[in-house]
Each structure stands twice: as structure tokens, then as C-alpha cells.
Design a protein with these regions (language model features):
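C-terminal cap of thioredoxin/glutaredoxin-like
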Residues: 4-5, 133-208
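Periplasmic c-type cytochrome electron-transfer domains
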Residues: 20-29, 119-125, 195
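Structural alpha/beta surface segment adjacent to cysteine/selenocysteine redox centers
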Residues: 50, 57-129, 199-203
Length: 208
């Protein structure tokens, strides 16, 4: 009797997860299966743009979620570059990483664009000047980072990542290179993160 009850409970639990995950509705498969950095863990990518108000609104919620991720899950951001005018902020993101000031300036650059409205996300010269001022670094060092070959190569990879994901906007979450969800698809920021949790749970089961 106990075995039957346990089986029923397991089936019910699976049904609840399956009911929440509706492929083609609140999540979908990526256009291409994308390689991940660590096959031993589950990868979560946020595709985002500093000029996106929805990304700005999601950022603090996402940061709290990332802090609670289990050890078998790792997170990284990839700037979306679906068109040329998004490139300056992508370059800023990678330059700040190279310069070691991402943690210091990530929220600040969002605030400059959306809260203070003192920075245009498409003005590369103004963005470079802002990073120089806020980082306290030598301007030549910042310029070299912005214009480095390695950053251009990384940006090309980011373009490929966005295309392979099949994302139609940002912010979008790519889970383990196979699935995507977003606030739009899921019906809200918290809902998107809950769906990501459910997808991660199912992927973890498949890996066993």
C-alpha cells in the first residue's frame, strides 16, 4: 500500500511540473543545441541589453535568484546583439569584464541609462567616457579594452549565441543550451525564474 501511495505521489508531482511547462507557450527549445562551458553542470545564460527597461527591472530579481542557485548550476550573462545599435553596450559589458570592474559598474550602468537617464545605450563614445570616469581607470587602458581583438571575437560569439537561441527579445534565459524562456513567455519575471527552476529540475533528472 505504501509503495502504491508513493508511486501516486511521484506521478502527481511530475504532472504538476509537466502542467507548468508548456513547450511552445511558456518555454521553447533553442533553434540549435548550444555547447555549454561545463558539461558536468547545468548552464543558465541571461541574454540581455543594458538599454532594455525590462532587463533593468528584472536585474535585481535575477541577482537574488542567482545567489540561491545550487552547486550544480552556474550562471552567466551574454549581451544580446540582434542589431548594430546594441553593439556599444555589448562592448562595454565585455570591456568591464576585461578591466575587472563588472561587479562595481553593472548596476550603475543600468541606472545611468534608465534611472538617471544620463547615458545613451547607442553612443559608444559617451559609454567609453562613462566607464573611464566611473571605473577611475586610465582612459587609454579603457580604450584598449573597448577596441581589443579579443572583445571583438567574443562579441561575434555573442551574436551567434543570440541567433542559436531563437530568442525574439530580451531578457531571455537559455537553460543548458537547449531551452529558452522569458518574462514575456512566462507571464512575468518571477514566473520566468520559476519556470527556469522547473526546467533545471527536469534536466537534472535526465542527467542521472
Amino acid at each position: 500500500m505504501k509503495k502504491i501511495l508513493l508511486t501516486l505521489l511521484m506521478c502527481l508531482s511530475f504532472s504538476l511540473v509537466a502542467a507548468e511547462l508548456q513547450i511552445g507557450t511558456n518555454f521553447d527549445k533553442t533553434v540549435q543545441v548550444m555547447p555549454t562551458d561545463n558539461k558536468e553542470k547545468i548552464e543558465v545564460i541571461e541574454l540581455f541589453w543594458y538599454g532594455c527597461i525590462h532587463c533593468y527591472q528584472m536585474d535585481p530579481i535575477l541577482n537574488d535568484w542567482v545567489k540561491k542557485l545550487p552547486k550544480d548550476v552556474y550562471f552567466k550573462r551574454v549581451p544580446a546583439i540582434p542589431r548594430g545599435e546594441w553593439a556599444p553596450m555589448a562592448k562595454a559589458f565585455y570591456a568591464m569584464e576585461t578591466l575587472g570592474v563588472s561587479e562595481k559598474l553593472h548596476t550603475a550602468i543600468f541606472d545611468a541609462v534608465h534611472k538617471d537617464k544620463t547615458l545613451s545605450p547607442a553612443d559608444e563614445k559617451a559609454i567609453l567616457q562613462w566607464v573611464t570616469l566611473k571605473s577611475g581607470l586610465d582612459r587609454k587602458k579603457v580604450e584598449d579594452a573597448f577596441n581589443s581583438f579579443s572583445i571583438n571575437a567574443t562579441m561575434n560569439k555573442a551574436v551567434q549565441t543570440f541567433r542559436a537561441s531563437g530568442a525574439s527579445g530580451v531578457p531571455t534565459l537559455v537553460i543548458d543550451g537547449k531551452y529558452i524562456t522569458s518574462s514575456t513567455m512566462a507571464g512575468g519575471n518571477n514566473e520566468a525564474l520559476k519556470l527556469a527552476d522547473d526546467i533545471i529540475t527536469n534536466i537534472r533528472k535526465d542527467k542521472k
